[in-house]
Amino acid sequence: LNMNLVFRLIWIVIKCLSRPVARNPKLPSRLNFRVMPTDCDLNMHMTNARYFSFMDLGRVDVMLKTAIRHGFFKERWGPMIGTSFIRFRRALPPFTKFQLVSDIIDHDDKWIYMEQRIEVQGELYAVAYFKGLFRAPDGNVESHRVMQKLNRSELVESRTELPTVFYQMEKVSRQIQ
């Protein structure tokens, strides 16, 4: 684990835990970062793996600033990613300021669906979609319990139709097995 990421993680944890749980969390969550030379590959742009690492930080931010953190700490929920898909649109050179935008799109009985975007001055540089869940010591946590902790009434009841990208992502992931 890169020390650069450890310091960023520590900063997010301190920032989130020093504040009370958001009663009505503002999602999407927005985090600002800068590409450091240690985030870059030989082509002198942010390495592909680092996008996923930053997105991990975004999901930690969503979890810790909301009441999901009570499930994480008190009920020992562990976040798990089932499927991820990313589309790179533009390269991020060193020292570029960017914003990571993380949002929960929907859920079904088991899975929670997220979209995360990396933007520079509002312009899309990468977009990723994740299907994940929380696992407790006694098994998977039903997604509606997670949504209740978010206190977002529009997401407590799952929609009947997910955005098309999630169906396509699932179809591709099943072909890879």
Question: For the regions a protein language model found, what residue spans apply to each?
Answer:
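Short coil/loop residues immediately preceding or within conserved phosphate-binding loops
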Residues: 30, 81-83, 113
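Short alpha-helical interface patches
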Residues: 49-57, 68, 144-150
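Catalytic strand-loop segment that frames the active site of acyl-thioester-processing enzymes
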Residues: 4-58, 164-177
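Short, flexible turn/loop "capping" segments at secondary-structure junctions
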Residues: 27, 78, 149-152
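HotDog/MaoC-like acyl-thioester-processing domains
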Residues: 2-19, 92-97, 103-177
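Solvent-exposed, flexible loop/coil residues
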Residues: 39, 46, 50, 76-77, ...
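Generic detection of intrinsically disordered/low-complexity segments and helix-coil linkers/edges
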Residues: 45-48, 82, 105, 160
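Hydrophobic beta-strand-centered segment that forms part of the acyl-chain substrate-binding groove
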Residues: 62-106, 127-129, 133
